[in-house]
Structure formats: C-alpha cells, structure tokens
Amino acid sequence: MPCVSHVTPVDRHSPIVIRQRIDNHAATINNNVVSRDLAPPRIGISRCLLGDEVRYDGGHKRDAFLVSTFGRFVEWVPVCPEVEVGMGTPREAIHLVASAEGVPSNAQPVRLLGVRSGEDWTTRMTAFASSRVRELKSVDLAGYVLKKDSPSCGLERVRVHSDGHVTRSGRGLFAEVLITELPNLPVEEEGRLNDPSLRENFVERVFAYQRLRALFTGRWTTHSLVIFHSRHKLQLLSHSRQGYAELGRLVADVVKYSRRDLSVTYQRVFMATLARVATPGRHSDVMMHAIGHLKRLIQAGDRDELLGAIEDHRRGIVPLVVPITLLRHHVRRHDLGYLKDQTYLEPHPRELALRNHV
C-alpha cells in the first residue's frame, strides 16, 4: 500500500496539495507526440471530504472511496472556501438567500448570509472564488469533487431561502465561479459518486481530460490530434454517436480552422461527449463494432462466447467487466494494433474495478 501524506492548507495564495500515489501507474498517451508517462491527475476537492475538520461545526465529511480508493491514483488539491475566506472553524452556519426579486435566476442572484447574524458574505466569497479559481488554473486540474448541499461548494439543488420558503434551486457561490471559469473540467459532487454509473463516468472523464490537456498544452500538430482522436474513437462512440460524428467531422476538416478555434472546439465537444453517461446498449454496440476487427482471427466458439457476454451485458445480466475482459484478451492475443491502442479498453486504472459495477 502506498504511503499517503496529508498536508493542511495554511496559505490560500499557495495551492496546497495532498499527494497520494501508487507505484507503476501512469495514464499514457502512446503516440509520437506525447510518449512520456503522465503523473497522477490533480483533482480539486472540498477539504472536509478528505477528513479535515473544517466544517462549520468543527467536524468533517470524510469519504472512504475518495480517500482510500480513488486517492491512491490521484493528487488531491484541497480547498475549503469558507475557511479560506476567513470564516474560521467552528463558525456560524451560512445559507443562500434569494434576492428581493424572489426565486433566484440568472438575473436574480442569491446572497450568502449568516443564519443567525445575517452577516453578508456574498461579495467576499465571490471575490475569493474568482481569485482562488485563477490559482487553481495554474496547477492544471483534471477534475474537481465538491461537497453536496454546501452554500459555497454545492453543485446543484442547494437550498435557497426566500420569505420563509425553501427551494432546491441554488448552486454554491464557489462552485458557480469554478464551472464558469473551467467549463470543460470534470466536476461532480461526492453524493452522486455513490451511483456506480456516475462514479465510473466521472473517473473516466478525469483521465481523459488529463490526456486531452497533455495534448493541447504541448506542441501539438494536426497530425498529433488525428492520432489522439483515433485512439479515443471507441470511447467517444460509447457515449454519443452524435458527439463522435461531430468530432470526426472536425478532425477531417482541420484545414478550415485556426489552431485556436480547433483547440477550443475540439476540447469542448470532446468533454461534452464524454459527459453523457454510457449505457449498456451503447457499450454493447461498440463492442460489436470491435468484433468486426476480430471475426477472421478468432474461432467460432470464442466468438460465440464473446457475443454471448456482450448480449448478457446489454440485458443487464453481467457487468461491463465481463465482455470487456474477453474482448481485451482476444485483442492482445492477436496483437491488433488499432484495437490495442483504443482507450476504451482501459480508460482508467483497472485496480479501481469501476467496470465491475456498471
């Protein structure tokens, strides 16, 4: 078991990192442009989820999966907006309150107020969030896990108070700035990660985003983009045929775009495509497509076994890991270069066993 070090943030102007690594793991872009191993992805996280006692009541919300399982493969960048903005621990509880116009909307912002005192933290929190997110951009995050229901960090359905009524219509002030400034970044709440499909999708997006950023922050060329896209074809197809087709057209017409427009558009559509959760039906279609490359190489009995496993997954009888393991076995056995290089076969560390549950 790798050694984990836990560093408590003391200066909000310096990104503080908890480093958690596992030997011999790397997300690799195996082409002529990026052949080095990538470091464990850096993930922003609400500090209380790591077990730090920074909650308003002096407690924490340690998440076992994030700390003990996922944490072995990533580098955490912990943030507690409420502590870092100067509220202290323990502290008065805060909540979101609708503006005088009524239910919040884009034109009707909410305020962040102390529950008892009514102290208004809105301006300070918004300014802090803008500054802190600028800092976070410099550490090249690959994802972010936010604390659900938090008036600062909640991503969706945060309680908003208005004239004695409460609606689940808000978003934390820090979370709002984060997703506005980093629109392609994989962001999720810890509560939703209890759903196996959402968990697998988030982790998949984290590692894909890291590979994507490694490409476009380097000295990329249209040729390297074509190679990158080719390796991700099946993975993209498993999420959305429409997104897959749109990216294919973009890559085919690279000469029509400036480098900046090509980079911005490809990254936006790539991440939007992966954000659509893959279904058993989509996975089954992709694996059937892959079998087309194998049909002349494997024996009838092996083909029937693989087809049966794919159909069982489509019907919800077996998890994705069953047909994927069989498919990966035949791809490696016959050394099929195109399929062997597909990120779809192993989009995240196998040790996480995420495909055992979807």
Give the label of every model feature segment.
Residues 59-76:
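Short catalytic helix/loop segments, enriched in acidic residues and glycine
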Residues 1-4, 14-16, 21:
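Short polybasic linear motifs
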Residues 132-216:
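Internal, conserved structured core segments that host functional sites
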Residues 46-47, 80, 145-149:
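Short beta-strand segments
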